[in-house]
Amino acid sequence: MASDTQQEKLLYSEHQRVPLVWWLFAAGVVAIIAWQAQMGRPMWAFYVALVVSGALAVWALIYFSRTKVEVTEDSSGERWLHVGPARLPASVVNRSLVIPPTAKRAAMGRQLDPAAYVVHKNWIPTMAMLVLDDPDDPTPYWLISTKEPQEVLEQLGRPIY
């Protein structure tokens, strides 16, 4: 696998990290939990609650921030979309479109096909939809949150509608 990644050319990369305000909110929640833990108890209860709840908060925020969106080109010229652990060759994408913030709710609502591959991050306002034409794959389309959907689709090299 290491030799495969060395031969791939990175065309686009995006880390989907949680907003800074989430870290501030988590710090406030950790402080409240620690303060409540020491009420009527020795001071060590404050420190234990601070360390435990702080570690859990940091782990949760890092866990939510782990998704990465990349577009690469392999040595044969095939472009690939990587979203988290999934990989999609551009050759199976029939058409693609940018979903603006105003249409995000509709795209994620009743119209959503249960067989679709969805990577949704609530704090990212825009999405990209890639309709697939692959007889070997039952997935009708990919719906992914991305900060720059136009750039992702342009780098993938497929028609944008």
Task: Give residue spans per PLM region.
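Hydrophobic, well-ordered secondary-structure segments
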Residues: A2, Q7-E8, V48-A49, E70, ...
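A generic structural signal for short, non-catalytic loop/turn and secondary-structure boundary residues
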Residues: D4-Q6, I62-F64, W123, D137
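Hydrophobic alpha-helical transmembrane segments
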Residues: M39-V52
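Conserved beta-hairpin
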Residues: V52-L97
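Non-transmembrane, membrane-adjacent beta-strand/coil modules in membrane-associated proteins
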Residues: H82-L143
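Cytosol-/stroma-facing membrane-proximal "stalk/adaptor" domains immediately downstream
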Residues: P140-Y161
